Amino acid sequence: MTFLYITCYCVAFNRKLLVFMQMEKGKHNKGGYSSISGPQVIEKSFNDMSISCTGFGSGSGLGGLNTDTDTFTSRPKGRTSGGTTGAGKGIGMKLGNTKKTNQFLESLKAEGEVIMEDFQPCSLQSRSSPLPPSDPVTVAVEEKLNVAVKRDGGVNNFDVQGTLALLVLNDADGLILLQIESQDIPGLSFKTHPNINKDLFNSQQILGAKDPIRPFPSGQNETPLVKWRIQGMNESSLPLSVNCWPSILGNETYVNIEYEASEMFDLHSVIISIPLPALREAPRVRQIDGEWKYDSRNSVLEWSIILIDQSNRSGSMEFVVPPADPSMFYPISVGFSASNTFSNVKVTGIRPLNEGSNPPKYSQRVRLVADNYQVV
């Protein structure tokens, strides 16, 4: 009899508890607030709540886990994440929000921007840093071009400035002499570092320290040893010539741009930037050897060619804009790089100063860059 009474009591208690929980559940579904504590609430806290983390681009400093109450969202049991509607006002920014991203891109397109389709959030892009030098000695040769070409032919300025710099990782490898060679061309003049033996360089083109027991500086920074300059070069020596031919036909201006490249150089990452009058939309490109991009904010049309070599020493582009004065398409800026130089300065060998020592292994980088190259 006692056992039967206890069983009936437990059944009645469970029924009351079930009714109570259903009432509390109804309060939650209607937006009510419950102060009940106990196992049921603890279970609900862990099963029905998900933590929203903010990214690096959020407005809370460096980002990370946001512990504000508004960044927590609850899902009723039995619903999948795809069926959840509405979000807390403080939920962190979703980097994959397709709707907002598309709206942003469409607004840029309306302004005339040419949008690259492989858009990625900048906070998630990995930026690879250049690899540190692996050889004990690294030689860096670089020439920079400062050129102003007249639109009707001839040059206002054609200046070439070069530098040979040395990077030595260890002091033990700094006791060396560098044998260099260069092309004998008119207008080429050298200037050595004050700590370089000038007589040795002028007589034998050997770079060595003025104090023979003093090694070249070591570390992670390059040390310039010699500089040079080439002046008096003419238009026939230009690595790249660019001509612009605008003509007005009716209510439109047809602009033909052409380039011709010298056989002396293979040019990499060529960008020809043509200024345009203020436009309401992107210019209409009718023909192009390469690719183009329109910068609506600066009103500049960029013509890019990945590589100019023996297969494409010349190329052209044609585009159409509303009527404009021919002077609006100048100055044209040109950028490129090459793996050889005008002077052909390079290190041909390294000799250790200590007798019986082996010369350290070295690598060499040679580069020509258009620092300021314009058609005016």
Curated annotation (Swiss-Prot):
| Annotated region (Disordered), positions in chain | 65-92
Q: Which domain of life is it from?
A: Eukaryota
Q: Where is the MHD domain?
A: 134-376
List the InterPro entries: AP2_Mu_C_sf (IPR036168), Coatomer_dsu (IPR027059), MHD (IPR028565)
Q: Where in the cell is it found?
A: Cytoplasm; Golgi apparatus membrane; Cytoplasmic vesicle, COPI-coated vesicle membrane
SUPFAM superfamilies membership: Second domain of Mu2 adaptin subunit (ap50) of ap2 adaptor (SSF49447)
Q: Name one GO cellular component term.
A: COPI vesicle coat
UniProt keyword list? Cytoplasm, Cytoplasmic vesicle, ER-Golgi transport, Golgi apparatus, Membrane, Protein transport, Transport
Q: Which Pfam families match?
A: Adap_comp_sub
Major place of residence:
cytoplasm
Asked if the keyword NAD belongs to this entry, the reply reads no
What are the disulfide bonds? none
Q: Name one GO biological process term.
A: Golgi localization
What is its membrane topology? Peripheral membrane protein
Compositional bias of kind Gly residues = 80-92
Subunit and partners: Oligomeric complex that consists of at least the alpha, beta, beta', gamma, delta, epsilon and zeta subunits.
Q: What is known about what this protein does?
A: The coatomer is a cytosolic protein complex that binds to dilysine motifs and reversibly associates with Golgi non-clathrin-coated vesicles, which further mediate biosynthetic protein transport from the ER, via the Golgi up to the trans Golgi network. Coatomer complex is required for budding from Golgi membranes, and is essential for the retrograde Golgi-to-ER transport of dilysine-tagged proteins.
Q: Please report which protein family the annotation says this sequence is part of.
A: Belongs to the adaptor complexes medium subunit family. Delta-COP subfamily.
Q: What is this protein called?
A: Coatomer subunit delta-4
